[in-house]
């Protein structure tokens, strides 16, 4: 019987690993098999927590702009579809947007998976997991890993008949979240002179840090009346807007 050791992939409350070749001495340890088993582990964990059959779950999956994102997303979506989970393929997205897919009523996902490795080198990737309570904590990730390492758990999740009949559904989450950001910016800015375009006359600088967030600068319509919109540095005062925009909170729990 093959033994699995995925504990080395745990980085606090995230999964992080080497997803592609390219750096000497760093072998791939987050490939299709690891992704398959971790995804089934998450589905089982979510089913247990919600006391809900796996085939009744709805899970969204999205990713940042990393080179391995599409392959990992395909593996995750196929894995979930084959065990009967309703899957929303959100494509390019941001971490806060993926959390909000559990909150927006037209999505109402039981859980979400964000494929990202934040600031790590190009050959790395990883997973952030969410439910309606926020980002999973270290203990939750440890439980998912234990399930992923268990053949009894993985093999007990039966493939549904004709899984191709219900493929992953593509959803424009980045557009929906952009609308959400626009509404929050209008609300927080409270510009009585330009209520629908509260940033009119301002010079705004947006720094996406090579991440997916840069697309929101184009999609959030309230930017369009600003003078000389640019990219390259942090948006001053964005903290207040981010807080209002639904950033995912960490669930209380042991983090050490």
Outline where the language-model segments fall:
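Gly/Ser/Thr-rich beta-alpha loop segments that engage phosphate groups in nucleotides
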Residues: 16, 64, 93, 128, ...
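An N-terminal, well-structured beta->alpha segment
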Residues: 1-76, 166-204
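N-terminal small/polar loop signature for handling phosphorylated ligands or for N-terminal nucleophile
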Residues: 44, 52, 58-124, 219-256
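Fold-independent oxyanion-binding glycine-rich loops
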Residues: 13, 115-118, 132-133, 208-209
């Amino acid at each position: 019987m093959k033994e699995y050791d995925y504990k080395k992939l745990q980085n606090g409350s995230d999964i992080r690993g080497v997803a592609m070749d390219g750096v000497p001495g760093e072998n791939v340890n987050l490939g299709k098999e690891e992704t398959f088993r971790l995804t089934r582990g998450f589905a089982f964990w979510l089913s247990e927590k919600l006391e809900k059959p796996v085939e009744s779950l709805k899970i969204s999956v999205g990713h940042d702009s990393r080179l391995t994102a599409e392959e990992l997303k395909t593996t995750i979506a196929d894995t979930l579809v084959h065990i009967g989970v309703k899957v929303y393929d959100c494509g390019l997205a941001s971490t806060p947007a993926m959390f909000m897919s559990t909150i927006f009523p037209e999505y109402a996902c039981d859980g979400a998976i964000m494929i990202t490795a934040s600031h790590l080198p190009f050959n790395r990737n990883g997973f952030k997991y969410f439910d309606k309570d926020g980002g999973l904590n270290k203990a939750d990730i440890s439980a998912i890993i234990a399930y992923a390492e268990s053949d009894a758990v993985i093999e007990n999740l039966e493939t549904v008949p004709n899984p191709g009949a219900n493929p992953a559904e593509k959803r424009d989450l980045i557009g929906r979240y952009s609308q959400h950001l626009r509404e929050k910016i209008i609300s927080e800015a409270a510009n009585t002179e330009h209520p629908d375009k509260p940033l009119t006359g301002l010079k705004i600088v947006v720094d996406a840090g090579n991440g997916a967030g840069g697309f929101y600068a184009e999609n959030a319509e309230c930017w369009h009346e600003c003078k000389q919109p640019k990219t390259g540095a942090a948006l001053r005062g964005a903290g207040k807007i981010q807080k209002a925009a639904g950033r995912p909170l960490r669930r209380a729990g042991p983090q050490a």
